[in-house]
Amino acid sequence: MAEAKITEFKKSDETHKISDKRGNGKLRREVWVDTKGKVVRYNLAYINQQLFQGDNGRVIGYDNAHGTHHRHYFGGVSPVDFVSFDDIEERFEADWLALGSMK
């Protein structure tokens, strides 16, 4: 029987607790890359069930599940134009920081 060829692997799987002073909740980052190091899947999320109980507490998120790049925001989902993974990370960070300034 032929051995299965690995075409992608999880490069990053991180969860960071946000202090109550900085807004509470968790930042979640998952990134999968192919054998050449190109990002093929990702999931970035700010989770805080005190702010939003729907969508498993995901307040803000970006991912490319189900074959499309999209943004989650308080339960709503909208498509995003994919330029690069770095661009997606910058958008996610900007959204999260903007949310903190609204409080």
Tell me what each language-model feature is.
Residues 75-103:
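Short, compact, well-ordered microdomains
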Residues 2-70:
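The feature represents the first ordered module of a protein
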